[in-house]
Swiss-Prot record:
Biased composition (Polar residues): 1-11
PANTHER family for the chain: TRANSCRIPTIONAL REPRESSOR NRDR
Family matches, as HAMAP family: NrdR (MF_00440)
Family per record: Belongs to the NrdR family.
Encoding gene, per UniProt annotation: nrdR
Any one GO molecular-function label of the UniProt entry: zinc ion binding
Transmembrane regions: none
Taxonomic classification: Bacteria, Pseudomonadati, Pseudomonadota, Alphaproteobacteria, Hyphomicrobiales
Superkingdom classification of source: Bacteria
Protein name: Transcriptional repressor NrdR
Keyword entries, A-Z: ATP-binding, DNA-binding, Metal-binding, Nucleotide-binding, Repressor, Transcription, Transcription regulation, Zinc, Zinc-finger
Length: 161
């Protein structure tokens, strides 16, 4: 692992432990060259994903970019960061287990919107406004109408056997 301070490749792991949900391993490292201490996180990756952009360009999937876009939609919202992390992990897991190594940006956007709808209505509308490229107030009204209609529909409790 390259040291973020001096770019040396000579680093040592001082401590490793799983996170609370055991989906990530947190490693404390120290650079042998400059003694800089830093933390890295290790996640399981089921497969390499390639994103097909709207213009046809193919780019490697970037989990951090997904997290940033979700965090932008959640800005100034009181949502527990752990719930956000779990949601992003669930989205990535869903994409990786989908069976395809290439996924369209539209498909990713729809999955994110589906998860945001369950997490926070305001974040859902914010994300939708960028993802669907809203141009007029009626675009917002349509999405708000979807949310209102969903709220009015009674949800049945799951049947337990």
């Amino acid at each position: 692992m390259r040291c973020p301070s001096c770019n040396s490749l000579d680093t040592q792991v001082k401590d490793s432990r799983p996170t609370e949900d055991s989906s990530v391993i947190r490693r404390r490292r120290v650079c042998v060259t400059c003694n800089f201490r830093f933390t890295t996180f290790e996640r399981v990756q089921l497969r390499e994903l390639t994103v097909i952009k709207r213009n046809g360009r193919r780019v490697p999937f970037d989990r951090d970019k997904l997290m940033r876009s979700v965090q932008i939609s959640l800005r100034k919202r009181s949502v527990d960061p752990e719930r956000v992390e779990k949601m992003v992990s669930a989205i990535v897991r869903e994409l990786e287990s989908g069976g395809e190594s290439e996924v369209s940006s539209e498909a990713i956007g729809e999955i994110v919107m589906e998860h945001l709808r369950d997490l926070d209505d305001v974040a859902y509308v914010r994300f939708a406004s960028v993802y669907r490229n809203f141009r007029e107030a009626k675009d917002f009204e349509a999405v708000l109408g979807e949310l209102s209609a969903e709220d009015e529909t009674p949800r049945l409790a799951p049947v337990r056997k």
